[in-house]
């Protein structure tokens, strides 16, 4: 299992969340602040099976592709040693 940590601009977060939940990914949304101008960003956390990581990233890329070359999200994929629901 992997944890995808996705940091996106506020105005993109709803679209990304809807896209991922429609594909049956479970998403936790955390408000955060970052960047030089302290602009509003959202951090999304996804617990994803190893074989679905590329699919999840592909969905995000398909919604955020930009012809201007602007980077609209930052993603980290980290291993999860243990996962429990209580």
What are these regions (language model features)?
Residues 1-86:
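Positively charged, small/polar-rich N-terminal and surface patches that mediate targeting and assembly
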